[in-house]
Amino acid sequence: MFSSGTTGMPKCIVHRAGGVLLNQKKELALHCDLAAGDRMFFFTTCGWMMWNWMAAGLGTGSSLVTLDGAPGHPDLGALWRLAGREGVTHLGTSPKFLQACMNRGVAPRLDDVEL
């Protein structure tokens, strides 16, 4: 796993396999209330640590929804339509994407989604 590289070059994060997975499962199960039957979608690339965090959701018995492409293509509503169509219960994305949606007046109804 590597750091994001936000403030410089990405750096390798040294860890042991079991401890990281156990902690991520704890975060998802206890802090996010993710469990069997839930569907998690966090728009991320596999190079960002959120991919590892999302993949750890499989340890809770939940399902993952992934997107191969841009969240704003063909329009900013595409990500929200995907979440609704796939029955996503837990959704995550970047603040920049949320700001872009706000700036363009995109206001999806997400009654059944935990952000």
Q: Model-derived features: where do they sit?
A:
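Conserved S/T- and glycine-rich ATP-binding loop of Class I adenylate-forming
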Residues: 3-6, 40, 91
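Generic hydrophobic alpha-helical scaffold/packing signal
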Residues: 1-4, 29, 44, 80, ...
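Adenylate-forming
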Residues: 45, 68-72, 88-115
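Active-site segment of SDR-like NAD(P)-dependent oxidoreductases
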Residues: 4-7, 46-47, 71
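Conserved AMP-binding/adenylation subdomain of ANL enzymes
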Residues: 21-39, 49-89, 104-105
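Beta-strand segments within the central parallel beta-sheet cores of soluble alpha/beta enzyme folds
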Residues: 15, 40-41, 112-115
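Gly-rich Lys/Arg/Thr-decorated short loops/hinges at beta-loop-alpha junctions or inter-strand turns
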Residues: 7-8, 64, 115
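Conserved AMP-binding A3 loop
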Residues: 1-22
